[in-house]
């Protein structure tokens, strides 16, 4: 579908995902809870037997690839205070998506959780031009940004107030492209 230049060719297509999201930030527990409806339309010429969602917050699970492969000393010959602070925080933090519920058109979905992604197996192939509606409920605790240095979390101040930083915070459809298929590499 693409010429040698890499630009889209004459048969280019692009998938469509429309989101309706409701979110609640609980300042006291430093957590968020959300529900969303994703209407996903298959504009590719292929029949899809499954779709993938990105669950970026699962990077903070104790058994995530990131945590299992990261040397806690940061790869240095010595350990600094910020590295010890991160390790101490992560040792007691219960991270990742909690209470994850996924339905397709109102029916519990058959899923395979794979780290920072989840594969949603469809009961029938999703043909070109067809849409499905995914209903997703979820919650997770926020990390302390000063300890973990993440794109998502909270920062506390001496006066007792917090600033909340939210990026990559909701389950979202993984890219499905004409040149790579599903972009489901672990985050």
In which residue ranges do the predicted regions lie?
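Beta-strand-rich interaction surfaces with strong enrichment in secreted/lumenal proteins
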Residues: 10, 21-24, 108-110, 121-126, ...
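Short, hydrophobic/aromatic-enriched beta-strand segments in well-ordered soluble domains
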Residues: 36-38, 42, 55-57, 130-144
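Short strand-edge motifs at loop-to-beta-strand transitions and within beta-strands
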Residues: 116-120, 132
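Extended, low-hydrophobicity, Ser/Thr/Pro/Gly-biased non-transmembrane segments
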Residues: 75-100, 104, 111, 137-187
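Outer-membrane beta-barrel and related beta-rich outer-membrane complex signature
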Residues: 63-69, 148-150
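N-terminal, polar/Ser/Thr-rich
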Residues: 1-33
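A short, structured loop/turn motif at beta-sheet edges
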Residues: 27-29, 43-48, 104-107, 124-133
